[in-house]
Amino acid sequence: MVRDGIYYVVAFVAVAILVGYFTIWPLAIIPLLLAFFFGWFFRDPERQIPQTVGAIVSPGDGKVTDIVTVDVNGEPRTRISVFLNIFNVHVNRSPIAGTIREVRYQKGKFGNAMGAISADANEQNIVTVEGEGQTVIFKQIAGLLARRIVFTKKVGDVVGRGERVGLIKFGSRVDVIFTSESDVSVKIGDHVAGGSTILAVARVAHGNAPVLSGTERGGAR
């Protein structure tokens, strides 16, 4: 379980104890059930990180809702959107190994994250990672329920492919934007797992950025 979930669990357990002590114990079942729910909701399972050279992995669990070509500084790029519902794991992971070059917070709306305009209009965190001979942008996008974006890294940090870098509370959307000279490995409607599902493989030269081998360890901070 990620650290952010501990507060919810402890709070509801405390409420259950107080309710059970000052009233009748059956009423304590409700806050206890909520404590179990939040413990499950903020789960943080280990993932097997792919070792494919040039692989771009999904930053989060969810369903692929969009694969389009977008313009980035006058150049065509591929954007894959993954929608996270309330039942998905909400931990976000780096799509590639490399160095974080930019982290930019953008204020915005809290509209339906599945909508086409949410990619630009909604509140979001925009992260640029450079490594393995490529530059990848991924966005943590807020939605109707998800109004709390957490990012645990900073500019200059070196991350491994699939390494935990944050989370979006209560579901939303992550976008990955990368060079169009890549072989896309998923299609719209596919269900993907953060850190382990390969979204695409770049057809570029690769550097020596770190790639975590096997199962990545350690929780989101």
From Swiss-Prot:
Please give the residue positions where the record annotates the modification Pyruvic acid (Ser). Answer: S172
**Protein topology in the membrane:** Peripheral membrane protein
Q: What keywords are assigned to this protein?
A: Cell membrane, Decarboxylase, Lipid biosynthesis, Lipid metabolism, Lyase, Membrane, Phospholipid biosynthesis, Phospholipid metabolism, Pyruvate, Zymogen
> Which Pfam family would be a valid example here?
PS_Dcarbxylase
Record bears the keyword Disulfide bond: no
Spell out the catalytic residues.
S172
Q: Which cofactor does it need?
A: pyruvate
What's the domain of life for this entry?
Bacteria
Keyword Oxidoreductase in the entry? The reply is no
Q: Name one GO molecular function term.
A: phosphatidylserine decarboxylase activity
* Site (Cleavage (non-hydrolytic)): residue numbering on this chain: G171, S172
Q: How is this chain modified after translation? A: Is synthesized initially as an inactive proenzyme. Formation of the active enzyme involves a self-maturation process in which the active site pyruvoyl group is generated from an internal serine residue via an autocatalytic post-translational modification. Two non-identical subunits are generated from the proenzyme in this reaction, and the pyruvate is formed at the N-terminus of the alpha chain, which is derived from the carboxyl end of the proenzyme.
Cellular localization per UniProt: Cell membrane
Task: List, alphabetically, the GO terms of the cellular component aspect.
Answer: plasma membrane
Name used for this protein in its record = Phosphatidylserine decarboxylase proenzyme
Q: What is the lineage of its organism?
A: Bacteria, Pseudomonadati, Acidobacteriota, Terriglobia, Terriglobales
